[in-house]
């Protein structure tokens, strides 16, 4: 067993035994040293062309003694886990100082210094090993929010750029000796999803895997992140990372953090962490909450069973950490709850589909192939009016909206990205999950890079063979999306009940047993075909679909079902009263036999 493996086993053991202590504010302690420009420059950067004071990460290279002393003080105060001083060690953040070329070195040194300090403390107290969390900060840019109020579809950073930044930082942290990766101070969940994607890519490419800690930031009394998500929606969006812990930090003091931490402690099937500020800043931007005051609030968290890991953020000092460590020492760590399997989606708000859920309406009018009005607006690049179509679907009761931009004369990828970016700026629409609908893999992936919530991909299938099917499934899993799986294989679409059952069973086994895809995130579409076509072989299409739904419900545990409801009445196009009547009768029987959701014109159904 390697040293790192032994430490990780010790970490797992410690989490079972007690509430672990994270360190406190690094910036707060650096300020106490009253460092000047020459301290930040040191000898190496004496002639740097721009001011560097305030670039706290640079102290890893110019004043490593200061960083090591602060980290030692936190360990002496009772901390179990040190956070590396790498909060801004990405190319995006270091560009403010023209120091992008130092990023890899900063991450290596950040982890190496913390590793040395932690190992020295472990030698003093072998029965209490210390650990290093390699920090990935949020950067100074947001992938979900436009910095230009006049152009809500504009972004000053892309998902791919963030991934590139985080890959470099992650590799440096691992080389330097980090035990865990901590993605923290998440104010935009899409940034965090990019970090998760990058970290998992490094794990896969470099044949190494460390536990991931995730910590979001509730920015104010609204109980939401800066990008608008609630606590539960945030958790649903990042849960695919299977983190060793999820928590909240920064922006709020412990007292104000309480309701959101309590909610997280009941929803998360992993360890829960918190590192709040020392209260709220005063008029001078300083934090006044004393160690005793903060420890009293945190002790109540521990007594209430909310905590597995606790530390401090802005304004906290070794004094705060010592008081907190002493206050929680007598309490058992929170027990991880058993959370029932369910499809847990999110937009700005959570949306759960389980055995008790009513039929889910997926709004179909934002599909360029199904709405002439929407198609015209997109072709004219009138995205503002196109948003009204989406809003009407949500207001009419759509709990998910299906977005499809597949049209021969359109740049489908650009249209998908633009529309999704604009939706992100409309909370009345973006509160619901998104279904990204395309037959083109590149359009689906471009769409996944735009949504901070947990959405649905529509669709994947075995049409191009099993290996391609598994590739698409793994990619969707990496992005944290649920998937619609069509009853379609190398031979063609399933058109009989027997074929529908056979293909769905085969797809399910491959996804669950070979890809490791969560069964609750699999949504089968057993193909709704038109009836009343005048062709005898088509007469049983609706019944075959309903029979397949019942089979999936009864034989493929936790999987869901969906379908394009308007297909069944296609023979009657132009006769809306007849079509609506057919839809209602069809849905009555399909839902009774297990149909979970349908792509419908929300508001025009009578069930």
Curated annotation (Swiss-Prot):
Q: Which residues form the Pterin-binding domain?
A: 359-607
Name of the top EC class for this enzyme:
transferase
* Any one Pfam family match given in the protein's UniProt record, by short name: S-methyl_trans
Q: Where does Zn(2+) bind?
A: 250, 313
Q: How is the cofactor bound?
A: Binds 1 zinc ion per subunit.
Q: Which GO terms describe its molecular function?
A: cobalamin binding; metal ion binding; methionine synthase activity
* Protein name, UniProt field: Methionine synthase
Q: Which organism is it from?
A: Pseudomonas putida (Arthrobacter siderocapsulatus)
């Amino acid at each position: 067993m390697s040293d790192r493996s032994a430490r990780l086993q010790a970490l797992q053991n410690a989490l079972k035994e007690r509430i672990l202590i994270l360190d406190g504010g690094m910036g707060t302690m650096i300020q106490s040293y009253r460092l000047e420009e020459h301290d930040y420059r040191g000898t190496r950067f004496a002639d740097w062309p721009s001011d560097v004071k305030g670039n706290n990460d640079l102290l890893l290279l110019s004043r490593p003694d200061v960083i090591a002393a602060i980290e030692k003080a936190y360990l002496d105060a009772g901390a179990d886990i040190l956070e590396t001083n790498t909060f801004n060690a990405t190319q995006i953040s270091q560009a403010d100082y023209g120091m992008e070329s130092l990023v890899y070195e900063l991450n290596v040194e950040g982890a190496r210094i913390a590793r040395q300090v932690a190992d020295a403390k472990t030698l003093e107290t072998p029965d209490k090993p210390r650990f290093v969390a390699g920090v990935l900060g949020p950067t100074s840019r947001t992938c979900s929010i436009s910095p230009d109020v006049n152009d809500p579809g504009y972004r000053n950073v892309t998902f791919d750029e963030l991934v590139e930044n985080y890959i470099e930082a992650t590799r440096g942290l691992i080389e330097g000796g980090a035990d865990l990766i901590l993605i923290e101070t998440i104010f935009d969940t899409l940034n965090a999803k990019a970090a998760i994607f990058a970290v998992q890519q490094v794990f896969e490419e470099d044949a190494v895997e460390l536990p991931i800690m995730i910590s979001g930031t509730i920015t104010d009394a609204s109980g939401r992140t800066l990008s608008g998500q609630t606590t539960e929606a945030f958790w649903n969006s990042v849960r695919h990372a299977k983190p060793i812990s999820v928590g909240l930090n920064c922006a709020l003091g412990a007292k104000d953090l309480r309701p959101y931490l309590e909610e997280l402690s009941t929803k998360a099937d992993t360890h829960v962490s918190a590192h709040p500020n020392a209260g709220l800043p005063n008029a001078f931007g300083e934090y006044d909450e004393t160690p005793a005051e903060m420890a009293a609030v945190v002790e109540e968290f521990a007594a209430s069973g909310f905590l597995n890991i606790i530390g401090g953020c802005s304004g906290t000092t070794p004094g705060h950490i010592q008081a907190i460590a002493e206050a929680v020492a007598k309490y058992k760590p929170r027990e991880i709850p058993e959370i029932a399997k369910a499809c847990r989606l999110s937009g700005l708000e959570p949306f759960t589909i389980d055995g008790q859920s009513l039929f889910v309406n997926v709004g179909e009018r934002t599909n360029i192939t199904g709405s002439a009005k929407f198609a015209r607006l997109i072709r004219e690049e009138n995205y503002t009016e196109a948003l009204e179509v989406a809003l009407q679907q949500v207001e009419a009761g759509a709990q998910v909206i299906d977005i499809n931009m597949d049209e021969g004369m359109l740049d489908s990828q650009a249209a998908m990205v633009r529309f999704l970016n604009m939706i992100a700026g409309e909370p009345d629409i973006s509160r619901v999950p998104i279904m990204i609908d395309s037959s083109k893999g590149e359009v689906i992936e471009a769409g996944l890079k735009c949504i901070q919530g947990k959405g649905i991909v529509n669709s994947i299938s075995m049409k191009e063979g099993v290996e391609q099917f598994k590739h698409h499934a793994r990619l969707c899993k990496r992005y944290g999306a649920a998937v619609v799986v069509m009853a379609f294989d190398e031979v063609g679409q399933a058109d009989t009940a027997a074929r529908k059952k056979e293909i769905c069973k085969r797809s399910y086994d491959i996804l669950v047993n070979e890809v490791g895809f969560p069964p609750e995130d699999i949504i089968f579409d057993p193909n709704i075909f038109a009836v009343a076509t005048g062709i005898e072989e088509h007469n049983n299409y609706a019944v075959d679909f309903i029979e397949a739904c019942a089979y999936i419900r009864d034989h493929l545990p936790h999987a869901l079902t969906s379908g394009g409801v308007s297909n069944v009445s296609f023979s009657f196009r132009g006769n809306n009263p007849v079509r609506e009547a057919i839809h209602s009768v069809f849905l009555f029987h399909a839902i009774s036999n297990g149909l979970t959701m349908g792509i419908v014109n929300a508001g025009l159904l009578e069930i």
